[in-house]
Amino acid sequence: MYDTVIFDLDGTLLDTLEDLTDGVNHVLSERGYRTRSIDEIRRFVGHGVAALMRLALPEETDDGIYAAALADFRRYYTANCRAKTRPYNGVAELLTELKARGIKTAIVSNKNDEAVKALAEYYFLGLTAGAVGGRADKPLKPAPDAVLEAMRMLGAKGGSTLYVGDSEVDKET
């Protein structure tokens, strides 16, 4: 029996794809690059925003332009991450039911830590015990570090914890 459930955020609890696409395309268009379709962005997500921007930018982009574009994306996305993002149908009810049954929940994402915490607080305040996002001092999923951090935060044990996600990266986690 599971007493703890840790969820991925993007594509699992929240539909963030339109805001991610808008953020990437804002950065690309400001630099005169071709913008990307929502389907292209869907294929690029899962390994964190650094990988997302690396894939979205032209292949020959030098490291200086990449670093500036990544910083611009982080600023833009953090300021606009709730414009079109919505929880999937039934997510709030699921989290409410898990809480009522005494099952602890948390969120783990490769998205930057500041945005993860802001989204979790805005959409799921009181429904999850916390959120862990990507940070420079920890490897991203599929490395287990963020999930293990969430488990420590919740006082959870491996054999009674379920991790739920939507991507190959989540499967490898």
Language-model features: where?
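Structural signature of beta-strand start/N-cap positions in the alpha/beta core
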Residues: 3, 101-104, 160
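Conserved SAM-binding loop
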Residues: 6, 13, 87, 105-108, ...
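Short alpha-helical
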Residues: 19, 48, 93, 114-115, ...
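Substrate-recognition element of Asp-dependent hydrolases with the DxDx(T/V) motif
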Residues: 24, 91-121
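Helix-loop "lid/cap" segments that line or gate small-molecule binding pockets
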Residues: 27-28, 48-62, 119, 150-151
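Substrate-recognition "cap/lid" segment bordering the active-site pocket of phosphatases
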Residues: 83-86, 112-173
